[in-house]
UniProtKB/Swiss-Prot annotation:
Subunit structure: Component of the NOP7 complex, composed of ERB1, NOP7 and YTM1. The complex is held together by ERB1, which interacts with NOP7 via its N-terminal domain and with YTM1 via a high-affinity interaction between the seven-bladed beta-propeller domains of the 2 proteins. The NOP7 complex associates with the 66S pre-ribosome.
Coiled-coil residue windows: 460-596
CDD domains the record matches: BRCT_pescadillo_like
Location of the protein in the cell: Nucleus, Nucleolus; Nucleus, Nucleoplasm
Protein name: Pescadillo homolog
Chain ranges of the BRCT domain: 347-440
An annotated Gene Ontology molecular function: ribonucleoprotein complex binding
SUPFAM superfamilies per UniProt: BRCT domain (SSF52113)
General function of this protein: Component of the NOP7 complex, which is required for maturation of the 25S and 5.8S ribosomal RNAs and formation of the 60S ribosome.
Organism annotation: Eremothecium gossypii (strain ATCC 10895 / CBS 109.51 / FGSC 9923 / NRRL Y-1056)
SMART domains attached to this UniProt entry: BRCT
Length: 596
């Protein structure tokens, strides 16, 4: 019989340590990390670490052997090796003082592309959209970061450009479905080609970058995610008949910026249109000139036509004019007219289509402009009125003014003054919320997450509970009326009990005649009575639960216990929130008393 070698089968064969993988690929550890991030390969946990590490118990990171074999044929790996040789040549040239040769080396430096990796990892467009959440979160994070030694200005500008291109397309196609304003930032959810894409946009506050963050890994992820978003944006823009990348209005970008600065050019249309539907000023002038030229040409044609008619008048005298018969439709009942399907399938897409919003200085324009435009509304910001072209803006069409101040002094007639939360709650509900709850200076209703738990805390449910309690109190009053009838029934029960006592006395006499004491008979009957009472206490549902628990496997039983524990924790959290709400209500009541 042939003796098997140790560590050649099983875990020892299927897994490779990180140091072995780096040695096999002949690259540095930093390049190995980058390659794993690009290809989507991550460390694995073997069942038996000792066997996988060939008898050693030292803490190590493991990878699948097949994954490392897969990396050996990667074109980017060859580019990493080329870059390594380039770095050696460059340091040698700079050490010798050969500046011209160093410049030539820099110009002829090899660059790698991640296009083929994107196509490998995302074979369909739906797969790319499903994995877009993390990409957008990373890009919006870097777009709001300040430029430092670790993060260059080029990186932040590229991230800002990509983010604005994404927002401009989402706003134009009206794809926003949900929004939630939290402490971390603003969460958005859009429906893109049937896929729900959710991302977080941080607030534009100065960021304090922690020192323990490894920006090398984050920048590698950013490089991959930016390539992915380029692919997705190109596909979405071209499918909607738009030119990618969109053109940028430099004047608007300097003054206001945001999505209104991007001009989305259609491939078929002869002019450019911005995200909010307003045409570019230069293109409007071109259109006016074209119309003038058209009028002159039409006048010239009319003159030429009249001269030709005068010359041919003699020949046309003999020609008789033939009038066509008019055919009337005798059927007066035209039937039901079918409504044409709307371009937008969601009610939120046309929620603000009839409104013009005026945004004050104290309100964040970038957040509300994106939401209002994506719901079909128009926006006029107070900051935009400071521009030179402010005279062309018609403020008389404003229907709603967003205010984040306690008191508005000079109110304009015909406008509805509301707080910004009205926009968020209307989008989440899919319909216009009553504006009287969101007036300036009013205490706002709770802004709840649209993705909240069904078991979670719902302040609106508390109102229903209070109503139920009031109904119960009414029932109690009705029960009090029926107490009189109950007293009559109690008197009858007392008579029955007296008869039962007489029967017991007779039984005692019979047992004494047989030679058995009554106390012994009572003791023997007591446990059976207790058991019957306990059985009665247990409901049918509890018995079913017990049976199910008995039939469960050990794994299922543990999972059930975990679920039970998590439900108990949720209930405790709900109770704490209710108590907090009560305390806040008490403090508010005390403050009102002090004010009065």
């Amino acid at each position: 019989m042939r003796v098997k070698k140790k560590n050649t089968t099983g875990n020892a064969r299927n897994f490779v340590t990180r140091s072995q993988a780096v040695r096999k690929l002949q690259i540095s550890l930093a390049d190995f990390r980058r390659l794993c991030i690009f290809k989507g390969i991550y460390p694995r946990e073997p069942r038996n670490k000792k066997k996988a590490n060939k008898g050693s118990t030292a803490p190590t990171t493991f990878y699948y052997y097949k994954d490392i074999q897969y990396l050996q044929h990667e074109p980017v790996l060859a580019k990493f090796r080329e870059h390594k040789t380039f770095a050696k040549k460059l340091t040698r040239a700079l050490g010798r003082g050969e500046v011209s040769s160093a410049k030539k080396l820099e110009e002829n430096k090899s660059h790698y592309k991640l296009d083929h990796i994107i196509k490998e990892r995302y074979p369909s467009f739906a797969d790319a959209l499903r994995d877009l959440d993390d990409a957008l979160n990373m890009l919006f994070l870097f777009a709001n970061l300040p430029a430092t030694d670790q993060v260059s200005t080029r990186v932040t500008k590229d991230a800002q450009e990509l983010c604005n291109q994404w927002l401009a397309l989402i706003a134009r196609e009206r794809l926003v479905r949900k929004v939630f304003v939290s402490i971390k930032g603003v969460y958005y959810q859009a429906n893109v080609r049937g896929e729900e894409v959710r991302w977080l946009v941080p607030y534009k506050f100065p960021e304090n970058i922690p020192s323990d963050v490894d920006f090398r890994i984050m920048l590698t992820f950013l490089e991959f995610y930016s390539t992915l978003l380029h692919f997705v944006l190109y596909k979405l823009y071209t499918d909607n008949g738009l030119v990618y990348p969109p053109k940028l209005d430099i004047k608007k970008n300097k003054l206001i910026g945001g999505i209104s600065a991007y001009i989305l050019e259609s491939k078929d249309a002869p002019f450019l249109s911005s995200v909010d539907g307003s045409a570019d000023s230069e293109n409007q002038e071109v259109q006016v000139l074209d119309k003038k030229a058209l009028r002159h040409a039409m006048k010239a044609d009319d003159k030429a036509g009249s001269e030709a008619d005068e010359g041919d008048a003699d020949s046309n005298e003999q020609v008789t004019n033939i009038e066509l018969d008019d055919f009337e439709d005798k059927n007066k009942n035209h039937g039901d007219i079918l409504e044409q399907p709307s371009q937008y399938d969601s009610p939120t897409s046309t929620l603000f289509s009839e409104f013009v919003f005026y945004i004050g200085r104290e309100v964040p324009v970038d957040i509300l402009e994106f939401l209002i435009v994506s719901c079909g509304g128009s926006v006029i910001s107070e900051a935009a009125l400071d521009q030179a072209d402010a005279a062309n803006v018609d403020v008389s069409k404003v229907t709603h003014q967003l205010v984040d101040r306690p008191v508005v002094k000079n109110k304009v007639a015909g406008r509805t003054y509301i707080q910004p939360q009205w926009v968020f709650d209307s989008i989440n509900k899919g319909e216009l919320v009553p504006a009287n709850l969101y007036l300036p200076g009013e205490s706002l209703p709770p802004h709840l997450s649209p993705w909240g738990d069904s078991v979670g805390y719902d302040p609106a449910a508390e109102l229903a509970e209070e109503e139920a309690e009031s109904e119960e109190e009414e029932e109690v009053s009705d029960e009090a009326e029926g107490d009189e009838e109950a007293t009559l029934a109690a008197e009858e029960d007392e008579e029955d009990e007296a008869e039962a006592e007489e029967l017991r006395a007779q039984k005692e006499l019979e047992l004494e005649a047989q030679g058995v004491t009554y106390s012994e008979a009572a003791d023997s009957a007591a446990p059976s009575k207790k058991a019957s009472k306990q059985k009665k206490r247990k409901t049918e549902e509890e018995e079913e639960k017990d049976l199910k628990l008995i039939m469960m496997s050990n794994k299922q039983r543990k999972l059930f216990k975990k679920m039970k524990y998590s439900n108990q924790q949720k209930e405790q959290e709900i109770e704490t929130l209710k108590q907090k709400k009560k305390q806040i209500a008490k403090t508010k009541a005390k403050l009102k008393k002090l004010e009065n």
